Each structure stands twice: as C-alpha cells, then as structure tokens.
C-alpha cells in the first residue's frame, strides 16, 4: 500500500514545486517589465500552451456576449465598493488610496485619456485578468491539490498578490484592490472560468474611473 502511495506523493510534490516556480517566474517577469505587456508575455508562455485552457478561452469569447446583466451587476458592485470601502478604511485611520499619478496625467487631457483607454482595453484588463484570475488561481490550485478548500485558498492568495501589485496606492489601495480581486475571482468561477466576462467588467470599471479623473471628479 505504501509503495503505491509513494509515486503518487512524489508526483503531487513535483506538481506543487513546478506550480510555485511558475508563480515566482511570472511575478518576477511582471515586476521586471512593470507593464501589462510583460504580464501578457509571461502568461502566454506559461499558460496558453495548454490546449484545454486555450479551447476554454475561445469558447468563453463566443459566449460572453449573452452575459450583459452579469457585466452590469459586477461593475456596479465593484463601484459601490470603490466608493464605500476607502471611507470605511479612513475611519480606521488609513489614508485614502492615492490616485494622483493618473489624475495628473489625464485631467482635461483628451489625448492622454484616449491613450490610457486604449491600453485598458488592449492590454491592461486582459493582462491583469490573465494573471490575477486565470493563471494564479490555476497554479495555486495545483499547489494545494488534494487539500480541502483548495480553490477558496487559491482565490485568497491570488487576491492578496493582486492587492500587493497596487501597493503604489498605499495600504488602503492594497486592501481595496485585494477585495476587488476577490469579487473578480468569484465572477471568474461563477462564469465557469470564463476570462472574457472578467475582462469586460475590468475594462468597464477602469473606463469609468478614467473618465471621472478626466473630468476632475474625485472618487477615492
């Protein structure tokens, strides 16, 4: 019995080590590039070679158009969170997330607004969802394979990393982004791991934010 279990244990251990190495490699590449282009390059190298993942992505691209109400609902929920959570965190003594870098870039500057929105819809939304949901959840599930609650634990850890990626906004920005990461992870799982619904929601949230900053509306 023990002889049969040993190869299984070693195989599981090997899978976990490989998953951790992939997570570390992707995070390192993203840090080096400091841009969504690096995120996409890393994810495509380490994830899209899997035939089943590519097929699932193509199927979900075809089907996402029927999910308009879901997009509206989750975009609304995230914006309610954006408006309320910083206020609650301020009561706990945390400063509000710092969005001054974006505000200074695009307020009243139509060319800058268009440039940022093009990035949002071509690389940022797709790249962050590929990393924050598709890749990290998949790899953490490989790390915790066979452990009860593996998916929930994977969502939490992936969302923590997603929050830390927004550390430039300060502690409250990390908490806000991490909480949004959990909501987007719930959407990803609820949509049977469709990335495209997430991409549209992510893009809509960022688009509204950029438009508000362009018109000088302070929302954080």
Model-derived segments and their meaning:
Residues 12, 16-24, 38-39, 71-83, ...:
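Alpha-helical transmembrane spans of integral membrane proteins, capturing the lipid-embedded, hydrophobic core
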Residues 48-51, 99-108, 164-168, 193:
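Short, exposed beta-strand "edge-strand" segments with a Pro/Gly-rich flavor and a Y/T-containing core
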Residues 56-124, 142-143, 147, 219-220:
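Juxtamembrane helix-loop-helix connectors linking adjacent transmembrane helices
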Residues 5-13, 60-72, 106-110, 114, ...:
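Hydrophobic, aromatic-rich alpha-helical transmembrane segments
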Residues 112-220:
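Transmembrane helix-loop-helix hairpins at the membrane interface
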Residues 30-32, 42-46, 106-108, 173, ...:
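Short secondary-structure boundary micro-motifs
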Residues 6-11, 24, 86-89, 97-102, ...:
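Generic detector of short, locally flexible boundary/turn motifs and exposed helical patches
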Residues 1-70, 80, 211-220:
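N-terminal, membrane-interfacial amphipathic/helix-forming hydrophobic leader that caps
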């Amino acid at each position: 019995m023990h002889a049969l279990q040993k190869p299984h244990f070693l195989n599981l251990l090997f899978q976990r080590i490989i998953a951790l190495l992939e997570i570390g490699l992707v995070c390192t590449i993203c840090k080096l590039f400091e841009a969504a282009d690096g995120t996409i390059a890393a994810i495509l190298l380490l994830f899209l070679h899997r035939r089943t993942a590519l097929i699932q992505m193509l199927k979900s691209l075809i089907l996402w158009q029927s999910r308009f109400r879901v997009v509206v609902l989750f975009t609304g929920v995230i914006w309610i969170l954006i408006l309320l959570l910083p206020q609650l965190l301020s009561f706990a003594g945390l400063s509000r997330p710092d969005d001054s870098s974006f505000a200074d870039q695009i307020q009243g500057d139509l060319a800058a607004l268009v440039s940022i929105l093009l990035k949002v819809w071509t690389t940022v939304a797709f790249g962050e969802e590929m990393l924050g949901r598709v890749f990290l959840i998949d790899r953490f599930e490989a790390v915790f394979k066979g452990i009860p609650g593996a998916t929930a634990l994977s969502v939490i850890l992936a969302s923590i990393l997603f929050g830390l990626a927004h550390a430039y906004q300060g502690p409250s920005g990390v908490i806000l982004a991490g909480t949004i990461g959990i909501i987007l992870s719930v959407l990803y799982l609820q949509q049977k791991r469709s990335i495209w619904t997430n991409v549209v929601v992510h893009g809509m949230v960022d688009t509204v934010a950029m438009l508000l900053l362009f018109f000088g509306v302070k929302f954080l």
